[in-house]
């Protein structure tokens, strides 16, 4: 590999801000924040969603009634859109 052209690949702490869950992994992300974890200082990347807070992984996923949403849209805007050519 050529020297000086690759980003710094290092251990980084990713912290889910919605549930205060954090994990350490390796990444090339550039951050200004740092955090001390397990007695060592790591760069900190703040994220909004992780496997601890995403509804798919937590089992709190809702199934949306998309047909009902489409009908509601058509009722609201159908007269303004006019006829659709087939």
Curated annotation (Swiss-Prot):
UniProt cross-references to Pfam families, sorted A to Z: Ribosomal_L31
User: What's in the keyword line of the UniProt record?
Assistant: Ribonucleoprotein, Ribosomal protein
Q: Name one GO biological process term.
A: translation
Highest taxon of the lineage: Bacteria
Residues passing through the membrane, by range: none
Molecular function in Gene Ontology? structural constituent of ribosome
PROSITE patterns given in the database record: RIBOSOMAL_L31 (PS01143)
Looking at the keywords, is Ribonucleoprotein present? yes
Q: Which GO terms describe its cellular component?
A: ribonucleoprotein complex; ribosome
> Among its keywords, does the record have Ribosomal protein?
yes
Q: Which family does it belong to?
A: Belongs to the bacterial ribosomal protein bL31 family. Type B subfamily.
| Subunit structure as annotated in this protein's UniProt entry | Part of the 50S ribosomal subunit.
Question: Can you say what this protein is called?
Answer: Large ribosomal subunit protein bL31B
Q: Which gene encodes it?
A: rpmE2
